[in-house]
Amino acid sequence: GNYQAESFTSTNLADLWRANVFGSINSSYPLWRGQPAPLTPERAYRYSPVAIVPGLSLNSNVNTLLAAYGDGNQQNTISLSGGPTLTLGNFSKPFLDYTQLSVTGGGTLKQGASPFDFDQAVDLGTLGVGITQQIAGPLLISAGVALNVDPASEFYGDVINSNIEVRWQRRSYDFGFYYNPYEGIGGF
């Protein structure tokens, strides 16, 4: 597509076409697996369309982005991220029966640079932490934060993303409100 956006190297607008290809592969390796609640609509499927199983798993993701721009520049990245996810509870009881905690670290190799400010790959080392907690019934609260942990980056130690979400989740639908303090946006 053709884009008009702020240039990465100046305050001027750049007007260039941009084409990209993205690929991603996820994997999960269970280290410990508990038992689900009885597989009935009143228990395991009370608030969720799938049975929540307590456990500990290692998750990983490999993705690549190949981007070409109208001025001849290219930006190519390959990223690897992973970490543990701990799930406690079955999300079938009325109070505090589901907690999920995730920690994810990641690194990115980059070749070239984007002429645009909005898609410049600058966070090449990241650390993220997220938690989801059942409060009462189908009411969940989630929060997450990601940091730049690349010591060679001028943004080292900066928050690169954050979110807070309150969600009402039932077996066949969910409704939520989120707010992203980093971006200053929210929605339903």
Give residue ranges: language-model regions.
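Outer-membrane beta-barrel proteins and related beta-barrel translocases across Gram-negative bacteria
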Residues: 1-188
